[in-house]
């Protein structure tokens, strides 16, 4: 399946079956007189057990947030005239939903018995009166948002051929607890938890490819050292503690290697180390400052920042340090590059008064500005390459935002006191 770019579903209703049953995965289809598909999330129903209005509310809220961000749909509120108690085929009439202009319908129900919960979801093609997808999940009432996000991922798989990233987490840096600490939250801002509690400065979190670990830089012992943390146990290990900077660590996509910035030999240079911090290998060797390495998805190249030409610019080199070439030719201050998981785009920040986020092809073409409001930094891709998370000062303070890969749908997801920055999106959980 080679065509899994972000889907802009603007499609004639008569083409829905072709979309859903394509053997080639996602297809981008446009035609004169077409319209964006209308999707409605009906109110979740109690199928048995105890009444749990919070489960119903959070289910609908999470599904609607996911589908609005997804972008291919016009998401509408459920029609009171069309609403009915049934969620399974034969338990409700499609005609009122057609009359309300609905193309795709999500129905769901729950059964809560004590601390056990079963949730059932259905996705329907209203135009044809057919069921597209049916799923059942078990868990606890506290799992409701995770389960709803899981079904959103399944919706994207059914309609595009690739699962969504909505079960992912975002790790970020925040001052909400005082000193800069690493926090973790659902991608939509819910279920926030503080990871580091060392009362020191902690920066630049990055997820392992498995999503089970992060690396980050901490000043807890005075020097900016690189640490690795297991997310499920909380166990931490210092893996790079050379004198000077041990920072901007980035896991390779195969999980075997970490690229980072070290200043142990003088100025800041790009190195690689093994996942346990051994076998340091220097990749750059200039008098310039070189920082912020990030891997290509095939592990063959590294994009990084260097001021070897006087101002910070983005460069690309082979993973062994050879074949260095300049990527950005516009702007005088370009930083924080990150390669798309699909390999087709590199996102970065450019200083233009404040900072704005750009995306560029790896060959240097199609350099496109994605943000304009406030100062925007630290862009990172979702695991499917359809979305980007970043920090922004718009609206006062500094918060974490998400947007589609083309810059549309910019939405704040972090709240509360303090300044939030340096987000990174986990692999699917």
Curated annotation (Swiss-Prot):
Residues 363-374 have a biased composition (Polar residues). Residues 362-383, 407-429 are annotated as: Disordered. Pfam families: PD40 (PF07676), TolB_N (PF04052). One of its GO terms (cellular component) is periplasmic space. Keywords: Cell cycle, Cell division, Periplasm, Signal. It is found in: Periplasm. One of its GO terms (biological process) is cell division. Residues 1-22 form the signal peptide. Its main location: periplasm. The Tol-Pal system is composed of five core proteins: the inner membrane proteins TolA, TolQ and TolR, the periplasmic protein TolB and the outer membrane protein Pal. They form a network linking the inner and outer membranes and the peptidoglycan layer. Belongs to the TolB family. Part of the Tol-Pal system, which plays a role in outer membrane invagination during cell division and is important for maintaining outer membrane integrity. NCBIfam families: propeller_TolB. This is Tol-Pal system protein TolB. It comes from Geobacter metallireducens (strain ATCC 53774 / DSM 7210 / GS-15). The gene is tolB.
């Amino acid at each position: 399946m080679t065509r899994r770019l972000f889907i802009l579903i603007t499609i004639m209703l008569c083409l829905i079956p072709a979309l859903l049953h394509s053997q080639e995965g996602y297809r981008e289809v446009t035609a004169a007189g077409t319209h964006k598909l209308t999707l409605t999330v009906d109110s979740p129903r109690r199928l048995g057990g105890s009444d749990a209005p919070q489960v119903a509310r959070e289910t609908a809220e999470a599904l609607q947030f996911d589908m609005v961000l997804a972008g291919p749909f016009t998401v509408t509120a459920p029609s009171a005239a069309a609403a009915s108690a049934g969620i399974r085929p034969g338990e409700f009439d499609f005609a009122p939903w057609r009359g309300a202009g609905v193309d795709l319908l999500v129905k769901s129900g729950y059964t809560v018995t004590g601390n056990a919960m079963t949730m059932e979801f259905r996705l329907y093609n209203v135009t044809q009166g057919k069921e597209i997808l049916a799923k059942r999940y078990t868990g606890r009432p506290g799992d409701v948002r995770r389960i709803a996000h899981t079904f959103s991922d399944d919706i994207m798989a059914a309609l595009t051929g690739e699962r969504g990233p909505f079960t992912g987490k975002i790790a970020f840096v925040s001052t909400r607890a005082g000193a800069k600490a690493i926090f973790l939250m659902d991608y939509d801002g819910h279920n926030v938890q503080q990871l580091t509690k060392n009362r020191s400065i902690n920066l630049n979190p990055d997820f392992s490819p498995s999503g089970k670990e992060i690396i980050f830089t901490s000043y807890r012992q005075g020097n900016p050292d690189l640490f690795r943390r297991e997310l499920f146990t909380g166990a931490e290990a210092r893996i790079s503690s050379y004198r000077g900077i041990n920072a901007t660590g980035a896991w390779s996509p195969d999980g075997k290697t970490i690229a980072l910035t070290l200043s142990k030999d003088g100025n800041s240079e790009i190195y690689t180390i093994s996942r346990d911090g051994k076998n340091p290998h220097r990749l750059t060797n200039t008098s310039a400052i070189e920082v912020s390495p990030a891997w290509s998805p095939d592990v063959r190249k590294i994009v990084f920042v260097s001021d070897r030409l006087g101002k910070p610019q983005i460069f690309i080199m082979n993973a062994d340090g050879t074949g260095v070439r300049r990527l950005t030719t516009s702007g005088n201050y370009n930083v924080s590059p990150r390669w798309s998981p699909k390999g087709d785009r590199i996102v970065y920040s450019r200083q233009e008064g404040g900072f704005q986020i750009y995306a560029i092809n790896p060959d240097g073409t199609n350099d496109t500005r994605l943000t304009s409001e406030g100062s925007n930094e630290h862009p990172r891709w979702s695991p499917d390459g359809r979305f980007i998370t970043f920090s922004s000062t718009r609206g006062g303070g500094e918060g974490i935002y998400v947007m589609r890969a083309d810059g549309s749908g910019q939405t704040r997801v972090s709240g509360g006191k303090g300044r939030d920055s340096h987000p990174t999106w986990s692999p699917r959980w």
